């Protein structure tokens, strides 16, 4: 039989970036722990999930509900195998009752080497989505023994009658970063430490693997009389035809070029014609609109608030004195003083800067790049791991805001300008090699 078709391998990633915590700041850590030089444990991060209002944290953990089905209220505590879930926090920014809430969260133990949150992935280990590793090499026949421990925290100002405000469910997970790599590493070791909280991640570069064109100078060929072959091979008269002069041959080539599709012709030779996105090879710039400031605000439009009670002037005294007004005014007034908390970001400048860095900076020659401190890269400079790990100083492209109407860096023209993720020739060559998402196949089995 003879089968020809195209296999769709499904998942394929011809872009930079990550699907794992893609909105996280690239220098933000996961909630995690580390030990200092005195072997004392430190915890840093977020406890996002509030417990039931009015219920305290107990040794069993964070109270997350009340079971009233039996007629008696029974506190429901978080199931440590997957609760509190790190993506669950307050339902709303509204918090005006003045009650003290207890909070819980998840943290990575110091034995899980810390990585930036951006790009972090840990496989689930149970059907609810919990990610903790098993303590035992073999799961127990009844209940798996997960590597999870509870850590309790109280306010630093409390000196007596301690009562935890926060419980962190600390765990070891199989932490991976399949789409990112470290580009800023303050610590000299990979182990969890205070300095490594400040690590920064960067997305991996798109990785197309395709061979180069061997006949890049060849336009078309002709196996019949125009090239002077024996007619027996060309099914014509058995006579040798003289070669045409150069002008005739060139005219014939140009005729074929205008009639046929060069890309289709090259594919017969397992080659690809390189294309180029015009915005990459030659950057067209007609100005960057950058007039208005762009602000971002907290969800509640205010920011952090303090709780205030109402007061009024005392009327039964000779001099003006103040008294609390708890008859008509609540004692839980959440008020922020000063202007609303806001931050400004220049969106246009960041989009332009990111475009230049991703499409120009990352494709500059290796001599313009450097290896980040404390990062070890392969000695073979031809490997993807080496090329992917090298970074460019952003200042190389930062300054090009007004660059004229048509502009390109010299290396974009004279140092392998086709080795770029926007070049359609690369994914096509990957496809021919069986490396891309779509893989043509042809299976022939003789009778």
Swiss-Prot record:
Provenance organism: Human adenovirus E serotype 4
Gene Ontology terms: cellular component: host cell; host cell nucleus; T=25 icosahedral viral capsid
Protein's cellular compartments: Virion; Host nucleus
Quaternary context: Homotrimer. Interacts with the capsid vertex protein; this interaction binds the peripentonal hexons to the neighboring penton base. Interacts with the hexon-linking protein; this interaction tethers the hexons surrounding the penton to those situated in the central plate of the facet. Interacts with the hexon-interlacing protein; this interaction lashes the hexons together. Interacts with host dyneins DYNC1LI1 and DYNC1I2; this interaction might be involved in intracellular microtubule-dependent transport of incoming viral capsid.
Note: All late proteins expressed from the major late promoter are produced by alternative splicing and alternative polyadenylation of the same gene giving rise to non-overlapping ORFs. A leader sequence is present in the N-terminus of all these mRNAs and is recognized by the viral shutoff protein to provide expression although conventional translation via ribosome scanning from the cap has been shut off in the host cell.
Stated name of the protein: Hexon protein
Family from the record: Belongs to the adenoviridae hexon protein family.
Pfam family, one: Adeno_hexon
